[in-house]
Amino acid sequence: MEPIYPFARPQMNTRFPSSRMVPFHFPPSKCALWNPTPTGDFIYLHLSYYRNPKLVVTEKTIRLAYRHAKQNKKNSSCFLLGSLTADEDEEGVTLTVDRFDPGREVPECLEITPTASLPGDFLIPCKVHTQELCSREMIVHSVDDFSSALKALQCHICSKDSLDCGKLLSLRVHITSRESLDSVEFDLHWAAVTLANNFKCTPVKPIPIIPTALARNLSSNLNISQVQGTYKYGYLTMDETRKLLLLLESDPKVYSLPLVGIWLSGITHIYSPQVWACCLRYIFNSSVQERVFSESGNFIIVLYSMTHKEPEFYECFPCDGKIPDFRFQLLTSKETLHLFKNVEPPDKNPIRCELSAESQNAETEFFSKASKNFSIKRSSQKLSSGKMPIHDHDSGVEDEDFSPRPIPSPHPVSQKISKIQPSVPELSLVLDGNFIESNPLPTPLEMVNNENPPLINHLEHLKPLQPQLYDEKHSPEVEAGEPSLRGIPNQLNQDKPALLRHCKVRQPPAYKKGNPHTRNSIKPSSHNGPSHDIFEKLQTVSAGNVQNEEYPIRPSTLNSRQSSLAPQSQPHDFVFSPHNSGRPMELQIPTPPLPSYCSTNVCRCCQHHSHIQYSPLNSWQGANTVGSIQDVQSEALQKHSLFHPSGCPALYCNAFCSSSSPIALRPQGDMGSCSPHSNIEPSPVARPPSHMDLCNPQPCTVCMHTPKTESDNGMMGLSPDAYRFLTEQDRQLRLLQAQIQRLLEAQSLMPCSPKTTAVEDTVQAGRQMELVSVEAQSSPGLHMRKGVSIAVSTGASLFWNAAGEDQEPDSQMKQDDTKISSEDMNFSVDINNEVTSLPGSASSLKAVDIPSFEESNIAVEEEFNQPLSVSNSSLVVRKEPDVPVFFPSGQLAESVSMCLQTGPTGGASNNSETSEEPKIEHVMQPLLHQPSDNQKIYQDLLGQVNHLLNSSSKETEQPSTKAVIISHECTRTQNVYHTKKKTHHSRLVDKDCVLNATLKQLRSLGVKIDSPTKVKKNAHNVDHASVLACISPEAVISGLNCMSFANVGMSGLSPNGVDLSMEANAIALKYLNENQLSQLSVTRSNQNNCDPFSLLHINTDRSTVGLSLISPNNMSFATKKYMKRYGLLQSSDNSEDEEEPPDNADSKSEYLLNQNLRSIPEQLGGQKEPSKNDHEIINCSNCESVGTNADTPVLRNITNEVLQTKAKQQLTEKPAFLVKNLKPSPAVNLRTGKAEFTQHPEKENEGDITIFPESLQPSETLKQMNSMNSVGTFLDVKRLRQLPKLF
């Protein structure tokens, strides 16, 4: 019978020394009851000390609650049911919400009560809002809710009910829904109240235990907790010998004996939440008459751990002192959930979120005041009544018999709670009745409400505020400091961080959990919290029909694409006072102060409208994936130059917007051309209007005064005139939009707001939107364009470095870069319209270290003939036939080529391209109208060069490279011009002047190229190019010239040069047969002996190499089809089938050489007379080009006979031009060692490719070009076979 003694009170009482038969005495001295020497480190105990409580909610539960609310046609209350469990590692708790209870009405209760709650159920009162737009910063708890929750916590801790951790967390949720055609978006606002008291535990030496049946049971393998499958706890007392006596929790003697601590069983770790709960019960149990603490205020915990045979002993110290009082904590969470209506809810992927105590918002203020009132009341109760509450005495203690016995314990508590919680119905009633006019709000809120009367109905966070107003008048608690609306406006105006949390607007879990840092970054300006919400809501209401139609995208983006900076989370960011002027949190970087006139012109209310206008897009779309604050700022500056033409100068508007206007962030999502979602939106022109409000003073007066007069008329109470004001505001918004649109149209051609042009260029809008949206994101990765431009115009984003890497401040560089990129835009737009235009330089626009953007184009163009006008220029040509085909303006040719030079070569401007990508489009338009200005381009180039010189390292090895390349580019450019348009000969002469001056200046400057940063960027470029090579050979090849190819090959010629690129090798292994590989290996063995002349000859032969490499015979049908479809292979004469993406470097180099050959065909004779510098690759390139001169410089299309003949004709027709263009090239010295733009192993792409087969004579070039099997000295087969295959 002994094992059951612990369970049977009669036996226990007779056996225990504490029974009546054997008197039990506590040690007469209460000092030194145990040895307090610590044996380990201390540990803190609290529910959320190690980990925030986690919520796991099933989707079906939310759907059921939503359906129930819709059926009831009102904001109905209901219950969600779940269970609270400790995590496996016992460091936190998880609340699983998986059931729905509509509740039932009870006559004597104002609120519904649970239909049938079972023991262990975690009850969550829930309110679902389906008919109104609620504020993201809604206050879930009313004052009554807080009061009842605190009382419930106190009752449970102080009572003798069985301890339930779930009762120590009082949770409520408000759900707001927004419905679209096929989906519903829910905002879940969770708020939980728990105790903040924590404990500090320190392990101590073992204390002897009286070996009672209970003690033996707990030490055995099958103890109570294991048998019952749950943890058990009880109390500790001591006998005269200072041995511990274990008592069950239900033992009546617990309440009459002095207690020294608690024991627990069935728990693994001391930091388990159950231990914390038991400590709270021990400290606050009102039935315990005497607790004996050590001299330092500690009590004992004996833990029978599941992993230890012997019990563990701890000293536990209440961090609040020996006589602690209740401290409470508010935990909140906000989640956004996007569900499709007709999709079966998956139970496998529940919604997960965390309850955290970090946020400081209006609800936190209410809570702190409610908790203070509660503590005041409790202390007064203690003073007035010496007895403990009657309801706590329902166990068998004898002195209880003298007091009336209440209803059994668990139920009275819950029933009391329900009676104490009439707040939800009352709250909804107050809100439904709109504002209580008798309680005027502070001025800031008045302004908000006056401006946006309808909002008040829809702002959920105002709802909680209303009860406070009500309570302020009617509840005594308020007098003691109950939260009221007054606190909120003050917070708004003072930069109180308390409201900061408001700025976390409906952020999806990814944002909240993934980027805690970002979340913190928002805090600094929280003062604007709720107010901006109000305006955002207003916008959604008043301008809903305008905006909502424009932005159909909203439904599903929030969860998937929340930006790390979460611009959309800033909608509340709006202002009540000038110093708060809606500055987005992300842009809180030090920013230039607003010019005084700017601030005066910017009307706050209009500002609100503008924010509101876009907030629906941003907050719903979640589209602004901004890579970095830098990018955001730069983009914002660019974008805002056009939004504020009327109010203040564009320049200052830029500064203003980037620094203080939330719009500064939004336009990324708003502007069609710059937003990832832009292509979905109707037109970029439709959106800017709202931004104009910022600087448009006239609308401001309208907005300001109308509401004010109305506010004087009592609008604070939202009188029946509310809807009239709403319609008035709607009208004003439409008026503003119309004005803004007119302003934009008027401003579209102004250079000060280049972006406008892009906006207005609706013809190109579709394509450009795609391009810029890819480029404007500062992602360095390969953004394949959609549609035709996938392979053709990928050049722009493929070869640009990430914007954030090293953005060049130099505006001129940016201009040139944007010019280039604008060409790319034109091309990509054209490619759709002009099937014949083959991928030109645009596709390889930023090709790696391929300097001659223009040259490559020439080669391509020459091959494809003038009718096929280079893809780049196609658009330009149509628009401005007088301008040379390639460039929107005559100057652009050189500026672009040189810009490319400084860009890919120096690498630096590439970055600036990205940072300024948003300007791409705008620059394009102005360029079309700009007259050629040689001096301007010259200065631009010099600016770039100087900048590069400043940022480059001291490597003097490569001074002439840039000059040479530039000269080549320009030469080729001129060739293009001559070949394409004789009428522009005079222009070319001008260009020569500019070119010569530029080269002279470059030489005098001693241009240096390969700084480490540039090397890095070049490496980046080459990586991109190598990827592109597989997609479009011309995208890479057309961008190569003899110079860049020579630079590629030179590394192989120089003894310390890097050998073959892995990619080139892999591709060669894939596409070349054994004979070809063996030829390559043999020819390469002679490579090192080549002198410049032999190099030249090899050069000429190089053209044949590409034939076999590119041959479509080695391609899959899908690849050939793809290449044909996008104009990467020619369909005429099956020449397309002959051309194939070879390896990046090979094809590039050969193509370049061919181009060079073509461009320099007249120097056939000089082919064997390269420049006097044997080392000069330029000579090689010239010679190679010369070599090709006799032969057609056509791309090595085996069957490309027609094109070859065309090219021949072109060359023969205009040999003078070509020769003339070539002349500058040999003059420039490009030493072999210095031409290695890609000196880096990563750039091996162009590593050891010997470009110039020495064995071939120039005259043989054509023959070999036509012979498909000929392979030049190109690759080292031995090395090839040693390297791993990449495909």
From Swiss-Prot:
Stretches the record annotates as Interaction with CPAP: 231-781
Modified residues (N-acetylmethionine): M1
Keywords assigned by UniProt, alphabetized: Acetylation, Chromosomal rearrangement, Cytoplasm, Cytoskeleton, Developmental protein, Disease variant, Intellectual disability, Phosphoprotein, Primary microcephaly, Proto-oncogene, Ubl conjugation
Keyword check for Phosphoprotein: yes
Expression by tissue: Expressed in all hematopoietic tissues and cell lines. Highly expressed in a variety of tumors characterized by increased mitotic activity with highest expression in lung cancer.
InterPro entries the record matches: Sil
Annotated segments matching region Interaction with RBM14: 1-1018
Any coiled-coil regions, as ranges: none
Chain spans, region PIN1-binding: 584-779
Span list, region Disordered: 378-417, 508-533
Compositional bias annotation for Polar residues: 517-529
Gene Ontology CC annotation, any one: cell cortex
Effect of mutating L64A: Reduced centriole localization. Does not fully rescue the centriole duplication defect in STIL depleted cells
Phosphoserine: modified positions: S395, S753, S779, S1135
Post-translational modification: Ubiquitinated. Phosphorylated following the activation of the mitotic checkpoint.
Induction info: Down-regulated when cell proliferation ceased. Accumulates during G2 phase and falls at completion of the cell cycle.
Assembly and interaction partners: Homodimer. Interacts with PIN1 via its WW domain. This interaction is dependent on STIL mitotic phosphorylation. Interacts with CPAP. Interacts with RBM14 and this interaction interferes with the interaction of STIL with CPAP. Forms a complex with CPAP and SASS6. Interacts (via N-terminus) with CEP85; this interaction is essential for efficient centriolar targeting of STIL and subsequent PLK4 activation.
Function per UniProt: Immediate-early gene. Plays an important role in embryonic development as well as in cellular growth and proliferation; its long-term silencing affects cell survival and cell cycle distribution as well as decreases CDK1 activity correlated with reduced phosphorylation of CDK1. Plays a role as a positive regulator of the sonic hedgehog pathway, acting downstream of PTCH1. Plays an important role in the regulation of centriole duplication. Required for the onset of procentriole formation and proper mitotic progression.
Clinical condition linked: A chromosomal aberration involving STIL may be a cause of some T-cell acute lymphoblastic leukemias (T-ALL). A deletion at 1p32 between STIL and TAL1 genes leads to STIL/TAL1 fusion mRNA with STIL exon 1 splicing to TAL1 exon 3. As both STIL exon 1 and TAL1 exon 3 are 5'-untranslated exons, STIL/TAL1 fusion mRNA predicts a full-length TAL1 protein under the control of the STIL promoter, leading to inappropriate TAL1 expression. In childhood T-cell malignancies (T-ALL), a type of defect such as STIL/TAL1 fusion is associated with a good prognosis.
Protein name (Swiss-Prot/TrEMBL): SCL-interrupting locus protein
Species in which this protein is naturally found: Homo sapiens
Organismal lineage: Eukaryota, Metazoa, Chordata, Craniata, Vertebrata
Gene it is expressed from: STIL
